[in-house]
């Protein structure tokens, strides 16, 4: 979020459901997020996935797919005036998704996939690369450089300013801590901000991968705590998944915040910014 340590003009807020469940569900969540979207201190993006291609189980809900999913995101964009983030898992999806999305996100498990990074970077969308749960934060500079050199071959090394100018961001979402658990090393925020703007993913950071018999679990009560800590360290924005009924969400319900909980969290974080 925007503090003295934040170099972007506004604090980025990326919020929305994990996966597209229906257009009605998207509209419901988008409506609840209007107070945050209208906050002049925030640069707001609505997020949702058209396909969750890395679900633990084959039986788990993945989403409506590329074509139908993008149609629904385009509807939200037109009806609410929101900028859009969605993630892509395969190279061929990038150019199609970029017709709707303002940010294309590369999932954490795919953060080293050169072909995917290159295809996404050839679009006009901002590139948001999630740090893999298995990655040394210092090594994310090489993923950033793949994107930067795709956009400008003259770039030899990644810097914060160069990445900001060329629309290449990183996203911290925790590191593997034994089996079925994650921990956030707050030092990674400072490390990665040496070579790119950094978004903190508060809700995936509290995930417990594969912790619910073929599904991931988590504890959303820790998300505000980690987000406040990240804001104090210094970040460029917040990523948080939200749902009107997390317990019945079709993906990552245990991690998600209700819209009113997210609004309170953002209010608290904006107060923290004023301390620096």
From Swiss-Prot:
It is an enzyme of class 2 (transferase). It comes from the Bacteria. It is found in: Cytoplasm. It catalyses: D-arabinose 5-phosphate + phosphoenolpyruvate + H2O = 3-deoxy-alpha-D-manno-2-octulosonate-8-phosphate + phosphate. Its EC number is 2.5.1.55. The keyword Transferase applies. Its main location: cytoplasm. Pathway: Carbohydrate biosynthesis; 3-deoxy-D-manno-octulosonate biosynthesis; 3-deoxy-D-manno-octulosonate from D-ribulose 5-phosphate: step 2/3; Bacterial outer membrane biogenesis; lipopolysaccharide biosynthesis. GO terms for molecular function: 3-deoxy-8-phosphooctulonate synthase activity. Keywords: Cytoplasm, Lipopolysaccharide biosynthesis, Transferase. It holds the Pfam family DAHP_synth_1. Belongs to the KdsA family. PANTHER family: PHOSPHO-2-DEHYDRO-3-DEOXYHEPTONATE ALDOLASE. This is 2-dehydro-3-deoxyphosphooctonate aldolase. It comes from Helicobacter pylori (strain ATCC 700392 / 26695) (Campylobacter pylori). The gene is kdsA.
